[in-house]
From Swiss-Prot:
Role this protein plays: This protein is involved in the repair of mismatches in DNA. It is required for dam-dependent methyl-directed DNA mismatch repair. May act as a 'molecular matchmaker', a protein that promotes the formation of a stable complex between two or more DNA-binding proteins in an ATP-dependent manner without itself being part of a final effector complex.
Family matches, as SUPFAM superfamilies: ATPase domain of HSP90 chaperone/DNA topoisomerase II/histidine kinase, DNA mismatch repair protein MutL, Ribosomal protein S5 domain 2-like
Gene Ontology terms describing biological process: mismatch repair
Name of the molecule in the record: DNA mismatch repair protein MutL
GO cellular component: mismatch repair complex
CDD domains recorded: HATPase_MutL-MLH-PMS-like, MutL_Trans_MutL
InterPro entries membership: DNA_mismatch_repair_CS, DNA_mismatch_repair_MutL, DNA_mismatch_S5_2-like, HATPase_C_sf, MutL/Mlh/PMS, MutL/Mlh/Pms-like, MutL_C, MutL_C_regsub
Organism in which the protein naturally occurs: Shewanella baltica (strain OS155 / ATCC BAA-1091)
């Protein structure tokens, strides 16, 4: 029997890695969470061969000072907490200080970082049995980049248990979807084997968040989802719940506590209990986010932090259950009209005449009792609905206690309820149903008939201007009042293209990969220029790398794809040495190089017509005034 001894640092870290680093997705999780804790607004994830060859995480967070780089790769070293009180009120993702040390013990890890206070970046990596950390200068913008190369290279047994590259990347992609839902304010990109797979742009408003919800959970879930928003004391529940009338069974089951994704049987039970009397769905889909006082939840109960323990679990369960039940009740009864109003709507439709010729204008009075002219085809289309309304009332009379209603879903359209009665189905029978209109849908149609007819006067509408005559293929002949002028078509094309590009620069241009990358001899300081202006280069849709003193141009925005890239890009990089161009200057640069070939006058005029009046006037001021009056006087005098 061997005596008791202290384990070598590398072996101790490898043992700890057994809990922290299960597979490449675990590495991505730990490193991205560190980026989020550092206040990053953008995180770029680059994966090669499912993560077994390369995992590269780049962020624009606060960075790590040079003096702390060595500590960052040491065990039990963290900036997230310092006392037991901090642990009991933890809100950050990481707090144990084990991730980087554990990952570096089973891979070749390099950490490059720079803070805003530093003039240069520093790079650190650990090697050897004692895991000694070496720090050296490097080029890098504010933020951090972590490269994990050859995961499990020194633990062959662990490497053999990895699945195929496709399977491992699927786990990474699935984890990114989960974090993208709760951190809508972060711009995430995911690249696999050099190809961008995911690009989750920041969702700064509800409409943008719904787009992200559609990207992650799919359109069937997003279109039918019921929005949840409630608060009681220190508890706040928000998110989206699958409609009980959704025809699709969703596998979306995401629950977050203070922004941390967890697996919890408590919330699953609350959801099933809320739906027990509402739908046939055995396990409805949901994206729920619970905000709670951090003192009321213990996040340090699972090695991978997948579970938490609530101090008052029964209270939390009942709160979630009540919130979901309230949302489902509103979905079926309170969204459009109350039950008392539904009876009145039924009476209106039942007592209405059954032929289109008998439906008179008073039947579709507006709110101000003004008559509305309804086209005959609209009246004819209303007749079948009137008959359907009578059928609904008679059918509903025999089903007391059944609630019909509609719920406005996440996209503002109506989620149609379905019959809650359970039926048996044969093996070849479809589960789809032919449903009658609900009472709330009938009420909505009645409100639609009360809408005044469309009038162009009601909108600030301006028809497209007719294109003026073209002179010599270069000018538009502009006639205004008693003035005649020539407007250069190319100057208009340049101005409209600048407006188009500048509007797109706000969210970033999409680069197009070149069939054959362009290679140019690189200057010695170009790598520093690329690192310093990395965000700007990505914003333009450019992908530039330097290898063996050669600048490799892989992606460019469509505006300069046809230009001489071997000349245009190096000239632009030279200008970056002296100043960072403003968005207007970037737009002008791209527009100038995009208009080197043939331009279509009708397309340019159409773009010009869509500009605001003040911008049109600025462009029109470039027109060359023709002295036609003096010319006529000269002709008359002759």
């Amino acid at each position: 029997m061997m005596g008791i001894q202290i384990l070598p640092p590398q072996l101790a870290n490898q043992i700890a890695a057994g809990e922290v680093v299960e597979r490449p997705a675990s590495v991505v999780k730990e490193l991205v969470e560190n980026s989020l804790d550092a206040g990053a607004s953008r995180v770029d994830i680059e994966i090669d061969k499912g993560g077994s060859k390369l995992i590269k995480i780049r962020d624009n967070g606060s960075g790590i000072p040079k003096d702390e780089l060595a500590l960052a790769l040491s065990r039990h070293a963290t900036s997230k907490l310092h006392t037991l009180d901090d642990l009991e009120a933890i809100l950050s993702f990481g707090f144990r200080g084990e991730a980087l040390a554990s990952i570096s013990s089973v891979s070749r890890l390099t950490l490059t970082s720079r803070t805003a206070d530093q003039t240069e970046a520093w790079q650190a990596h650990a090697e050897g049995a004692d895991m000694a950390v070496k720090v050296m200068p490097a080029a890098h913008p504010v933020g951090s980049t972590i490269e994990v190369v050859d995961l499990f290279f020194n633990t062959p047994a662990r490497r053999r248990f990895l699945k195929s590259d496709k399977t491992e990347f699927t786990h990474i992609d699935e984890w990114l979807k989960r974090i993208a839902l709760v951190r809508g304010d972060i711009h995430f990109t995911l690249t696999h084997n050099g190809k961008m797979v995911r690009n989750y742009r920041p969702a700064m408003n509800e409409a943008q968040y719904l787009q992200r919800l559609t990207q992650v959970c799919g359109r069937p879930f997003a279109e039918q989802a019921l929005k949840i928003e409630c608060q009681h004391d220190d508890l706040r529940l928000s998110g989206y719940l699958q409609s009980p009338w959704s025809p699709v069974i969703s596998d979306t089951h995401y629950f977050y506590v203070n922004g941390r994704l967890i697996r919890d049987r408590l919330v699953n039970h609350a959801v099933r209990q809320a739906f027990a009397q509402k739908a046939e769905l055995e396990q409805p889909g949901y994206v729920l986010m619970l905000d709670i006082d951090p003192h009321q939840v213990d996040v340090n109960v699972h090695p991978a932090k997948h579970e938490v323990r609530f101090h008052q679990s029964r209270y939390v369960h009942d709160y979630i259950l009540q919130a979901l039940q309230s949302a489902l009740e509103e979905a079926g009864e309170l969204n459009f009209v109350h039950s008392s109003s539904l009876d009145e709507v039924e009476d209106v439709f039942v007592d209405a005449p059954t032929s289109a010729t008998e439906i008179s204008a008073p039947f579709v009075l507006g709110a101000d009792s003004a008559q509305v002219n309804v086209p005959a085809d609209t009246l004819e289309s209303a007749q079948p609905l009137v008959a359907s309304a009578v059928q609904v009332k008679s059918a509903g009379a025999g089903r007391e206690g059944t609630s019909f209603g509609t719920q406005t879903n996440a996209f503002g359209s109506m989620a149609t309820p379905r019959d809650n009665s359970r039926g048996s189905y044969s093996a070849g029978e479809s589960r789809q149903r032919t449903e009658l209109p609900s009472k709330a849908a009938i009420a909505s149609y009645g409100a639609l008939l009360q809408t005044p007819s469309y009038s162009v006067k009601d909108q600030d509408y301006q028809p497209s201007l007719p294109m003026p005559a073209i002179l010599d293929g270069q000018y538009w002949v502009m006639a205004t009042a008693d003035k005649l002028s020539l407007l250069p078509i190319k100057s208009v094309a340049l101005a409209t293209r600048c407006q188009e590009i500048e509007a797109k620069l706000a969210t970033g241009l999409i680069g197009q990969p070149l069939l054959m990358p362009v290679s140019v001899a690189a200057d010695a300081d170009w790598q520093a220029v690329l690192d310093e202006h990395d965000t700007l280069i990505r914003q333009l849709g450019l992908e530039l790398t330097i290898r063996y003193q050669q600048l490799i141009i892989k992606k460019v925005p469509p505006y300069i794809r046809e230009s001489q890239l071997a000349k245009v890009i190096p000239e632009w990089l030279q200008s970056l040495r002296f100043e960072t161009p403003a968005p207007s200057a970037l737009a002008f640069w791209l527009a100038k190089h995009s208009l080197t070939g043939f331009v279509s006058a009708p397309e340019i005029w159409a773009a010009f017509s869509q500009l605001a009046e003040e911008k049109k006037q600025l462009i029109a001021n470039k027109a060359i005034l023709l002295p036609w009056q003096s010319w006529l006087e000269e002709q008359a005098s002759e």
